């Protein structure tokens, strides 16, 4: 590799590194520094204040309804703890 091609490769590499280090990701609706634009916030508050409820369509599949079913995580039978308690008391 001659000197001129090495210089070109180094300049390109430097340009890529500078671009990656100086770029900033802006999420949708957010301004730099994590600030949200006031207009979008007002629109969100207005939408929440209307009281509209989003419901599932009537022809929702059984799989979708099963996925959205509530789970009872508190009353799960506690079989592990019951076995451990019986083992410790023996």
UniProtKB/Swiss-Prot annotation:
InterPro entries in the cross-refs: GnRH, Gonadoliberin
Signal peptide feature range: 1-23
Assigned keywords, A-Z: Amidation, Cleavage on pair of basic residues, Hormone, Pyrrolidone carboxylic acid, Secreted, Signal
Entry's localization field: Secreted
Single GO cellular component term: extracellular space
Molecular function (Gene Ontology), one example: gonadotropin hormone-releasing hormone activity
Pfam families in UniProt: GnRH
Miscellaneous information on this protein: Teleost species possess three paralogous GnRHs: mdGnRH and cGnRH-II have been identified in tetrapods; sGnRH has no tetrapod ortholog and is thought to be a duplication of cGnRH-II.
Designated name of the protein: Progonadoliberin-3
Organism: Oryzias latipes
């Amino acid at each position: 590799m001659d000197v001129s091609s090495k210089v070109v490769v180094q300049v390109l590499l430097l340009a890529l590194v500078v671009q990656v280090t100086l770029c900033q990701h802006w999420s949708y609706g957010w301004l730099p520094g994590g600030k949200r634009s006031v207009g979008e916030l007002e629109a969100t508050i207005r939408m929440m204040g209307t009281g509209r409820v989003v419901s599932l369509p009537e022809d929702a599949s059984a799989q979708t309804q099963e996925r959205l079913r509530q789970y009872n995580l508190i009353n799960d039978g506690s079989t592990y703890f019951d076995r451990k308690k019986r083992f410790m008391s023996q």
